[in-house]
Amino acid sequence: MNFLGKKVLVVGAGKSGISAIELLSQEGAQTILYDANEEINKEEISKKLPIDYKGDIILGGLSSELKSELDVVVLSPGVPTDLDYVKELKSAEIPIIGEVELAYNFSKGKIAAITGTNGKTSTTTLVGEIMKTYYKSVFVVGNIGVPYTQMVKNTENDSVTVAEMSSFQLETIETFRPDVSAILNITPDHLNRHHTMEAYIEAKVNITKNQTKEDTCILNYEDSYLRTVSGRIPATILWFSSVRELERGLFLRENHIIYRDDEKECVVCDVNELQIIGKHNYENVMAAVGIAIALKVPMDFIREAVTKFRGVEHRIEYVTTKRGVKYYNDSKGTNPDASIQAIKAMQTKTLLIGGGYDKDSDYDDWIKAFDDKVTYLVLLGQTREKIANAAKRLGVKNIVLVDSLSEAVDFCAEHAGVGETVLLSPCCASWGMFKDYEERGMLFKEYVHALKDE
């Protein structure tokens, strides 16, 4: 798509929107930055835009006159596609694309795209580390924090772009075709945005829609949703499993990660060599290895990278030990499945800090996963009473409601015994109390480090 001289409305004044404006301005488009939130500070937005930006910034409503003049609309990932004004733009037959589709117009080299309800950031980061051991030009972008549009003009024909893709980003792709895609797992999440599980699954599977048999899709064999949809995925599928041996793919045998194809079988590594804990992390490693194999990285390079990988911040991140109590930060555990994995990874009695913004999740499976491991459930945020009621119904005894994260940390520090663990794994989004899960995790670590050692 040629944007020279085109009038383009970029919707969303966040990081993705600003980055899209920069790229489109470089391509000679007439850009307009729009956000429905009238309370945003225009001056603050202006500071983030290119110095030579000459386009308008519009907040609140869109005039009919402007709508009639638009050639293209670029939606930021955080903007739901079912908003009234977005529907009006669609009905006017104005082409609407997302930030990923915009970036893809300019992307060179190979692309590995990773999605899934949980494990995206860890897997994307690990794939990036593996690629950097073998390829000279590697870019790690997407939902991981760096907009695809920000880096895409730096890509060359010999580059590898590793992109973390959320369901929000995948809703608006049209021609995006990764050489390798991966869907790590699908469990209920973001139903406040997608409304139905079927719509959420479709958004995830969208990552494969333009692939062909020449491309590869990495899938988790133990995910029933993925087994169900696999028949209509056009790419060549490479499965992984943490439960059973596969005729072809990646799997666990005792403590070893094994790769088997039509010709041979080889040991990738012993899981005891890994610096990350939990079965879910072994699955992330298998997915990353599958992507690397599909992109022709030699096994020696893969093995070196996976055994050095220390994980990502805010995902079952060891913080410190205070007075014989270990503290773990799993602020990225924003849904039941992610938080279940965090609890399973704990080796001792655990004081669990949970609660936050309500994404219409059901918490029963999360609570049932406590078994006898969770000694105190400390709850905060919008969902604290909803979770507390579910926990009481399921027989959880020690439930404590607090008003702040600092209060939660202080309570746990006072009640945790030597050899026990304090885990922040909220099972909820951070919105309302914190800017994002990163701020929540950073504050948790700050409060923990401020605790007295004696």
Swiss-Prot record:
EC number: 6.3.2.9
UniProt KW keywords: ATP-binding, Cell cycle, Cell division, Cell shape, Cell wall biogenesis/degradation, Cytoplasm, Ligase, Nucleotide-binding, Peptidoglycan synthesis
Reaction(s) this enzyme catalyzes, per UniProt: UDP-N-acetyl-alpha-D-muramoyl-L-alanine + D-glutamate + ATP = UDP-N-acetyl-alpha-D-muramoyl-L-alanyl-D-glutamate + ADP + phosphate + H(+)
Pathway involvement of the protein, from the record: Cell wall biogenesis; peptidoglycan biosynthesis
The keyword Cell division is annotated on this UniProt entry: yes
UniProt organism field: Lachnoclostridium phytofermentans (strain ATCC 700394 / DSM 18823 / ISDg)
GO cellular component, as recorded: cytoplasm
Subcellular location: Cytoplasm
Superkingdom per UniProt: Bacteria
Chain positions recorded as ATP binding sites: 116-122
Name of the protein in question: UDP-N-acetylmuramoylalanine--D-glutamate ligase
A single GO molecular function term of this UniProt record: ATP binding
Cited function: Cell wall formation. Catalyzes the addition of glutamate to the nucleotide precursor UDP-N-acetylmuramoyl-L-alanine (UMA).
One GO biological process term: regulation of cell shape
Family: Belongs to the MurCDEF family.
InterPro entries named in the record: Mur-like_cat_sf, Mur_ligase_C, Mur_ligase_C_dom_sf, Mur_ligase_cen, MurD
